[in-house]
Amino acid sequence: MQHHPLPEYPRPALRRDSYENLNGLWQYAITGSAGLPAKWDGDILVPYSPETKASGVGRTLQPGTWLHYHRSFVPPAGTGGRVLLHFGAVDYACAVQVNGHLVGGHRGGYWPFVLDITDALNPAGHDRLWVAVQDPTGTGVQARGKQTLRPGGMFYPAQSGIWQTVWLERVPENYITELTVTPDYDARTVTVKAHTSLPGGAANLWAVVRAGGVTIAEDWGSDEADRDGAVTLHIPEEHFFPWSPDSPFLYDLTVGTTQGEEEQRDTVHSYFALRKWSCAPDAHGIMRFCLNGKPILLNGLLDQGYWPEGLYTPPSDGAVVRELQTIKELGFNLLRKHAKIEPQRWYYHCDKLGLIVWQDMVNGGGPYKLWFVTYLTNVFQPLLRRLPDARPLWGLLGRETEAGREEYARELEATVKALQCHPCVGCWVPFNEGWGQFDAAGAVEAVRRLDDTRLVDEASGWYDQGGGDVDSLHNYFYPLRVRPRSRVVALSEYGGIAWPMPGHEPPRRAYGYGTAKSRAELTARWKKLQLETVLPQLKKGLSALVYTQVSDVEDEVNGLFTYNRAAIKPDPAAVRAVNQALEAAFEKIVE
């Protein structure tokens, strides 16, 4: 593992020229108190959690203990303005000091945050950074996904602390803190609003749109922009290139603000796409997902985003790109990002490659009664999948406390705000299989208040309350029978055929849904499932497929890839051929 991992710019949707990456070797200590450790335990490779092999530590942070990080740093070149310290994600709660001064903190293990550290910097240099972290894992109500201190089966080792890139940038005194970019497919426009650090906003906002390096729209500080801090640019018809999996066109966007002196100017670079999601009946009156007004078969994989050496954190940006490119080459166009939020670069690569993402809200809440929420409901799903998620059920689902419900509302808003800039995100998934579920109808309303341009899968699997855009089925055990409904039907989890590929076996007991004994058997069973079980249901309304899963994960050996992504387990040519057959059948059905 390199000593300066993941050097790439971490925030592609809001880029500046100033950038100083702080990934690399830091000092660390795990103690029983929040105070500065008397001594350090050794080095840790940031941004890998201490539980991972890649970190060089291999220790688990227990609830009630503290993980401390320390390093020296040099601020980005230049003078004046402000110096900002960015964290891609820290799990779960942290306090940050620079040169002994508390500069801020954060709670929430999946979302980026930024701290202005200018006033704490040492004029003579020799700046030092200290981060103290706590992570309650399963003892709290916070979002935690599949993390557990007792891994096995469908739950995986906990990870904690810094797990995404840490970086610095120098900005003007009045700088752009956030861009709100709102494309309108039907109007062929994009509206840009810049939020700035000082009261009064941007005194003068300008924006330029380029397509393939050619300037196609610009506004250099109109009166309209001056009044409301936003500007709308019109895309010429000859440069109207809708985004889709077959043609994932991205427009380049440059935005700037000026306010008198040169040092008050700020310029950022971004991008956007023109695309539109909807649900509408096909030629036979059956409800379908539509992208840019045309029915589309969403054919994809469940993606949990784990890596053997780094758990949540990939070994390199290149490894991420290779995985996503291979998924696309196999003929898939969809990934359901399950129980995790990825670093911004992951979504950027999906934007570029044309991979649609259904994004789960990361599950949290108190302890789940798994005998009820997972095992009993899975076995008796036809009877239980539409149980009302009213208050009497909240204790079984881990949402009995007001604090847990408030935490979920905060996390939902943070997720939508963090990811709504990415064209690849096509659907929000508030709940999965009842884990931490409560008032799913209210969650749908909350999502749509934040973002009404995307689909919503209210409750993936079960405890479906009849809302959102998707009738979302999980089926591993029963014959698949689909019938047209008022919402679009998605098979949002299925398959999961296990095969522990020789040389890539899991460290503990293998886990999956039925086991193949060879590559040939795995390929044959996968083809049979897709062509004999799934394909006939397309004409009955099935419009989205999410096979479990992208890769093996810890004990789970039901991936199409091995855990290290070194091999594709079924025959790749067969996978491509089957996906082509599904696409051809769907196109014929909806004609």
PLM ranges: what are they?
Residues 128-131, 247-259:
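Short, aromatic- and glycine-rich surface loops/edge beta-strands on solvent-exposed regions
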Residues 179-180, 254-327, 581, 586-588:
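N-terminal carbohydrate-binding accessory modules
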Residues 96-98, 189-222, 231:
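Beta-strand-rich binding/interaction modules
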Residues 170-200, 283-288, 582-590:
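Surface beta-strand/loop "capping" patches
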